[in-house]
Amino acid sequence: MVYLPFLLIFNLISYFPSSSHAQNADLILPLKAVNLGNWLVTEGWMKPSRFDGIINKDLLDGTQVQFLSTKLKKYLCAENGGGTVVVANRPSPSGWETFRLWRVSESCFNLRVFNKQFVGLGSQGVQAVSDTPTDTETFEIVRKDDDRNRVRFKASNGLFLQAQSETLVTADYAESSWDDSDPSVFILTIVNTLQGEFQITNGYGPDKAPQVMQDHWNSYITEEDFNFMSANGLSAVRIPVGWWIAQDPTPPKPFVGGSSIALDNAFTWAEKYGMKVIIDLHAAKASQNGDEHSGARDGFLEWADSNIDETVAVIEFLAARYGVRPNLAAIALMNEPRAPGVTLDALTKYYKAAYDAIRKYTNAYVILSARLGPADPKELFSLASTMNRVAIDVHYYNLFSDSFSGMTVQQNIDFVNNQRASDLGSLTSANGPLVLVGEWTAEFARNDASMEDYQRFAKAQLDVYGRATFGWAYWAYNCDRNHWSLKWMIENNFIQL
């Protein structure tokens, strides 16, 4: 870490080191940026082959599963969602019949239920009452060799879980068969999966994960990429990072060290090619949105007031380490906090504290991400008005909502030209904060679009998002899905910046 002497008081509450003023003197807004997604924070959908070397790669942390008793033809269920017994009496599955895996080893798991307790052994049978998993909440999932969705559960006592009746599930079965009449046999259905940083590092385990991650960091983004980006008109990169970077080189397991060195390299390369850097805290400890890219273990959003101090500490680490870098443009405090799980009150407390932490080291811009879900980005305006050099971050995708599924190409373009332009215009005012469209892409919910269609859609977004006062950042630079990859889009003449 680098600590600089304080020089002057700014805005009554902010202190800046002397070098910080020169730092942003050459910052030209608006920025034309691209996100270096799936580099320092894993998003498996962007390059699925990264997971190919994991044994039982379909059973990673956070995989949501359901189990049908072959004998009873009923689903296992955590009665009342948890806090009591496990039964096998549901004819169809829903929330209480869905379990989230915590991976202990290649074949051993904890099963977390709807109310967040763990399935375990009890005196009256199998129950879901423990808030913390121990050996008695750990089960080996034994899969049939020629039918991987046919499973049995070996408990810590060495015996198998069985559905004796619809209301009695025990772990006392010693027989071994795969017949439908066997009460210990269940049909596994995978409902949802996560492929984030926790999943890939815990999936490979402590022996393999360090090398797997290092190889990825060294190859996925290189100096040549910064040369390419700069040569094609980009002025900045937005780099997602996870909370574990602050504990390099020995972050808590299963995360592995090395991401801070990769980020160091990015700053050096960016400076060489005349580019600025936005550091984006994409993954906060306890997860601010439950998505895989937040570093979540099992998809539960659990970030709250109790996590504010440790999240501020991550921001302070970033500001201390990179605040002296002349090409630091901004630090984004938290990516996509989701409402109502993350309350405005908690977020405001965090944003205030994180802003103050940054101002100990640098006058770089501070970016406040708008909440996802039922929240208005303008809810941050009053907070932003008390701060200096801040921007509000909004993300615009013509995806992830049923409202886009039936749109024609022209309707997608019209939506950008009309609705998105209106949304962006409402956030832009002479006295308000700057605005960053921190994520957007040229993909939409069409599988019949032509090259010209994509070109028109991309151009419409460039025209509209070009009005954002802080700038925009395309998602992403490198991706297996072509239209999500700005590098591919440029190389194949689908977009002109």
Q: PLM ranges: what are they?
A:
Residues I28, V191, S287-R446, L462-D463, ...:
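Active-site region of glycoside hydrolase catalytic domains
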Residues G44-L59, K253-G258, A286-D305, R389, ...:
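Aromatic- and acidic-residue-enriched segments that line the glycan-binding/catalytic groove
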Residues F16-T63, G158, T189-L234:
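N-terminal carbohydrate-binding accessory modules
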Residues Y454, G471-L497:
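Extended, alpha-helix-rich binding/interface surfaces that flank or overlap catalytic cores
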Residues L60-N192:
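Lectin-like carbohydrate-binding module/patch detector with strong preference for beta-trefoil
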Residues V2-A22:
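Cleavable N-terminal signal peptides of Sec/SRP-targeted secreted and luminal proteins
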Residues A236, P240-G242:
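Mobile, glycine-rich extracellular loop/lid and propeptide segments
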Residues T63, P210-Q211, D215-S235, P252-H282, ...:
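An active-site-proximal structural segment forming one wall of the substrate-binding cleft
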